Amino acid sequence: MLQVYLVRHGETQWNAERRIQGQSDSPLTAKGEQQAMQVGERARSLGSTHIISSDLGRTKRTAEIIAQACGCDITFDSRLRELDMGVLEKRQIDSLTEEEEGWRRQLVNGTQDGRIPGGESMQELSDRVHAALASCLELPQGSRPLLVSHGIALGCLVSTILGLPAWAERRLRLRNCSISRIDYQESQWLASGWVVETAGDVSHLDAPALDELQR
């Protein structure tokens, strides 16, 4: 059975400012760096062997800090990037017009092929993160990879493994530097394929990120 750990990046400046990030970027806050260090300590105890990270700056930095603690090599995979939020990226959530908020709601509420102008749909996101996850099955026997990605991307992945629609990720609270675990099992009795063992564990952290206190 293959165990895969999923980690959301540490808190960023735009998380604290409640700005839409998507595939745009902002640096980790001091809190975010500390969160990543705490994940690193946990990753070392979990026996992580590989770190596979989104190639965006906030995930790269989170992965680098984790790697320093557990001594793993890092590879980058653009398929683990956050949902492309198109023209709304860099905007403060509270500044959206009624029309812009309508675009966002269509996307997260499951409207068929809903997307923000210039962005991607939840189905497109689901397809690419599942392709990235499938690549883990090609790792050597005994591997225990840790994937560093983003809130919507990881929520979409966990939701769809559970058999829920991609937009159900809004019902999952995956805080900054939370750890989830999924397993790949082959069984004639239990469900074969990917199963969710845990989601959104923050027992290794001190406190939630600023943007999540307001949800």
From Swiss-Prot:
Q: Which residues form the active site?
A: 9, 82
- UniProt keyword list: Glycolysis, Isomerase
Q: Name one Pfam family in it.
A: His_Phos_1
Q: Name one GO molecular function term.
A: phosphoglycerate mutase activity
**What are the EC numbers?**
5.4.2.-
Which pathway does the database say it acts in? Carbohydrate degradation; glycolysis; pyruvate from D-glyceraldehyde 3-phosphate: step 3/5
Annotated site residue numbers, Transition state stabilizer:
150
Q: Which PANTHER family match?
A: BROAD-SPECIFICITY PHOSPHATASE YOR283W-RELATED, HISTIDINE PHOSPHATASE FAMILY PROTEIN-RELATED
Q: Which HAMAP family match?
A: PGAM_GpmB
Q: Which family does it belong to?
A: Belongs to the phosphoglycerate mutase family. GpmB subfamily.
Q: What is this protein called?
A: Probable phosphoglycerate mutase GpmB
Q: Which organism is it from?
A: Salmonella paratyphi C (strain RKS4594)
The organism's lineage is: Bacteria, Pseudomonadati, Pseudomonadota, Gammaproteobacteria, Enterobacterales
Originating gene: gpmB
